[in-house]
């Protein structure tokens, strides 16, 4: 019956746009022509006018789609997303067009399958579902449901924070500070280069690398979208980077978009923290419930009810934050804004730096490999500098663990040069501890901040949860966002940095020697050896203040000087011969109460007279004398410098 009616009407309802019934000359079809013999028309008179009107509308629709098909044939799609207008406007119009086309196709299929009795209803449905045709395409107010960011909101928020930091670093105020202050700072000039163009080229390369990381994350998000127009965005970014055309108000729009996104990021950070609280409450609730189920007591406490109330309230908080944060935002909505930000950053970096980083470095790739960042040594050298600065602050009380840690962390080149440099190091005049610290401060005052920036840069916002756990107000400038790579040890020359570190270690050795000497109340043996005489150690002037020697010590010294040694007898046997007498007065024994609570020291001075008997000078360091007698003053093998007496810290 349906096929019979379609033939009698002269309309092909199976056509895609239902326009085959319209005459080629534009005339209206004659629905009232005479029927063949034996057949009667089933068309109601009032129905004929409605069908003529609907066919006219379908004819107009056919003309529109035929125009779009001819346009599509001229522009062959090569897989690269094309945005002839602003990306957000073009994407919305394309999305609306796809929705309208799908509606027309679906309605046409329904119309071809429908019977004559439902023809009017189907045509009415087709007319009511069609949207107005505008210059931007078919606009539809239907939002895509079920395509929210969800758990990806935290990763997207981390990406938005990166874009905010990059835009902030490209502001006019920060660029003026970069060119007027940072590039002329002592740390950059001494460790990196004093060529302004070379420094500017390094900064431009760093900014483009940050943009590449940000755009790479945007491309990754686009490939996960259900809408195919967001796929392969890298091709689109490559094309617009080669055809950079300035656009009006692009900067103002991008800054406004970033500010709006940062508000959502703030709510997302709060959501991250509240989800952790919710997880702990759920875990506590389940544990409490199991305990009460396994409990022998029939009466249950109020603890489970309280936890249940807190859990219910926390779920409401999480639900509210999900609506305010990026969690409930649509994928396409956020992608539009991220694409606009990438477009703005491409133009902004080009306007500020031009093609500075495109020019090859004069020193070539070999010089680039000698820098600490590409070699992966920036953070290690920064830790060494921080250790030196810490030891300078407490030079008089350096522990053996701190000394060993610093020595073991030194690079091989510095270890090889340390021995010869310490032996050849001479001071024109005797310097006090304050003067030595002032001399070291001339280098440390610019070297330590560079090391600190390196540490901060390595512990910056990298992981998804770090920015959320800090609890920072992301609507303001993030902490550490103003640190540029040029301010760290990343671009520092390895050779220059090792020279400055070696100089600080030599001065540190001299400082520790002087600090220990002053702490004992007088000078001591100089640890700085002359290159002409490295074997003999000379005693310097007498100490300013002489410690009091007890009566027992004086008696022991007198007896030791009068005693005659037996030939061919070792020292230990010689002492054993006077065992009974030594037991009566034994202040030199480690088990004696005299020894307890006395601080140990590694310095010693022993005078010998022509008689061959050692005279122990307790005025210099009586603790070292005990170590020599007990033979516990032998240093570890790897400390060759300590064994020679050249290194005292």
Curated annotation (Swiss-Prot):
One of its GO terms (biological process) is response to peptide hormone. Disruption phenotype: Reduced response to phytosulfokine (PSK) in roots. Small rosettes and dwarf plants as well as early senescence of older leaves. Reduced fertility, premature senescence and severe dwarfism in psi2-1 psi3-1 plants due to reduced cell growth and proliferation as well as premature leaf growth arrest. Plants missing both PSI1 and PSI3 are dwarf and contain reduced starch levels; these phenotypes are partially rescued by sucrose. GO terms for cellular component: mitochondrion; nucleus; plasma membrane. It is found in: Nucleus. Its main location: nucleus. It comes from the Eukaryota. Induction: By sucrose. This is Protein PSK SIMULATOR 3. It comes from Arabidopsis thaliana.
